Amino acid sequence: MTKAVGFVSALIFALATVSAARAQVMLDVSKITCDQFAGYKITTPQNIAIWLNGYYSGKRSNTVIDMQKLGENTKTLERYCIQNPQILVMNAVETIFGEK
């Protein structure tokens, strides 16, 4: 009985100390469609919009984030993407906001 208790205790300790393995997911944002963006098929639109904002801000050497404008732009992009599901989301950004 004491061997079983010791074994179970050791097993619980071992399992408790093992960190959960997290899968690393790689995305090619240039291939995300509006359908995937607006349909929450990859992640939330906000997460993708934050990345897009950083990407285009970096191209302009802009280090400031206007959080209100980011939210408004995300909603504008979502509305556009709902109406144009087959377009790539980066092309949608370039069409709506004139980014290149």
What are these language model-derived features?
Residues 13, 24-27:
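Short, flexible active-site loop motifs that bind/organize anionic cofactors or intermediates
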Residues 26-27, 40-100:
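Compact alpha-helical subdomains of small soluble proteins
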